[in-house]
From Swiss-Prot:
InterPro entries: Ribosomal_Su5_D2-typ_SF, Ribosomal_uS5, Ribosomal_uS5_bac-type, Ribosomal_uS5_C, Ribosomal_uS5_N, Ribosomal_uS5_N_CS, Ribsml_uS5_D2-typ_fold_subgr. The keyword Flavoprotein does not apply. Belongs to the universal ribosomal protein uS5 family. This is Small ribosomal subunit protein uS5. Keywords: Ribonucleoprotein, Ribosomal protein, RNA-binding, rRNA-binding. One of its GO terms (cellular component) is small ribosomal subunit. The gene is rpsE.
Amino acid sequence: MSRIDANKLGELEERVVTINRVAKVVKGGRRFRFTALVVVGDRNGHVGFGTGKAQEVPDAIRKAVEDAKKNLVEVPRVGGTTPHLVLGRFGAGEILIKPAAPGTGVIAGGPVRAVLELAGITDILSKSLGSNTPINMVRATVQGLTELKRVEDVAKLRGKSVEEILG
């Protein structure tokens, strides 16, 4: 899959999913740092996520945004939903993403909702299965979205026309 240049997409919207304080125990006590999980997207079929770690929260968020812009993926959409049902997996986290009729809205939990909304999906059903750790849910969602295929791609793979595929 080719890399998407964030500079060519224009304005990307950022959403902080989680901020976590982590500690390193040393001889003199605990050293605290912050990790941030951020999702970025243009609400037009491009979305990415990133993580950052720093001694201060704003620095962690800035690093996470930079990381997210390097990890953008393209999401195929049909109207405001996905072309077909997909199951995304990462670690113990699983997410079921199911197309929905117009007017349904985004039915998804916190981290998954952030990814789907910033990808530009307006009508979707989802169910998180397994682990509910935010980073695993985000990774599973993005992994599932990358598995989506357009009708044109499926037709080309099977050596058929789009009309034959659609029935």
